Amino acid sequence: MKKITALMLVLCMVFSLVACGGSAQQAAEKVEEKAEEAAAAVEEKVEEAVEAAEPAAESDVKVAMITDYGDITDQSFNQTTYEACKAFCEDKGLAFSYYKPASDADDARVASIELAIDDGYNVIVMPGYAFAGAIAATAPEYADVDFIALDVSSGDLGDDYVLPANLYCAVYQEELCGYMAGYAAVKLGYTKLGFLGGMAVPAVVRYGYGFVQGADAAAAELGVPVEIKYVYGNQFYGDADITAYMDTWYAAGTEIVFACGGGIYSSAAEAAVKVGGKVIGVDVDQAATIDGLYGEGLTVTSAMKGLAATVNTMLGKVVDGTFQGGMVENLGLVSAVPEENYVQIAGSTQFSDSFTRADYEALVADMFAGKITVSNDIDAEPAVTAVTVDYQGNIK
């Protein structure tokens, strides 16, 4: 019908040409030319309609996330990774599930990985250095499965371990967002700071040493004396002993504590609310969680890693066939725009006239441009010029 209509329109045009004095031969040539164009256009439309009507091929990508010793409600690594995987898979129409190991042990994590593979999942996502042993045991054995490990370094896997082509590991430059948090805290007017680390693993140490460097830089700019108390809880959760330790800090004048280590924030928050103190969150924006549990406005900022961004990037590469393993990628600043980076502080930061969002953006731009450098050395305490740091070892 569309072809007939098109031809009729063309004939009308031809008759108009003849009526205006055109020759019969010219008219015939015009008819043939216009008819061919109309037929081609109709054929193209039909092909487009057929393609649109055809169902998209079902992807064979099936994604499984394995939790570490926590759960998907931990408001930290597990939850962020789970939610990012789930959202990506729902958007792309991919099968997704998660598995929780029976215990905090390598053999339990191996069992969960193998169960997921037996269930048909061919992409395994794992958050945290605790997976190193399980990865070493499984990745080489399942060459047709893609493994994505977040915050797992070469050192975690072993100096002699050769990464197989199906294993991608991401680590983060925590010293950079730690620096941002320390700088922001001092610029916002806090001069008695604390750092409560979970365990002294490389990522936590980088956070802490970056925090010290950032606070030192801000103190030097402002010309104010700043004190920092620094300790590790030797665990990634809060308890009565750590809360009591934090009580002594806040009672002695500590104004704000960077609680760096999963659920260990609970001890800092419990102590802070008793005296009107503040806390800084870690890994993800913890303001909603901490403030929801302990009181509005308690969380000044959070030093964050781009876990969700990494998940989206790597799963996207799996889907489009560009996934490349056999590497440990060190993720940090990729832009002068804060939100585009793999390390940053939270959008919920309590900016003020003394440290505005524009000030933060300028800080990130200078860091990206190399005007500000931050040491990632974890073997020696960072050199400082304007702050006093009291390193107190481990609480336990």
What feature does the model see in each segment?
Residues 16-19:
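C-terminal motif of bacterial Sec signal peptides marking the signal peptidase cleavage site
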Residues 25-396:
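A residue-level marker of the well-folded mature domains of exported/periplasmic proteins
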Residues 21-23:
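Membrane-proximal amphipathic alpha-helices
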Residues 1-9:
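Positively charged n-region of N-terminal signal peptides that target proteins for export
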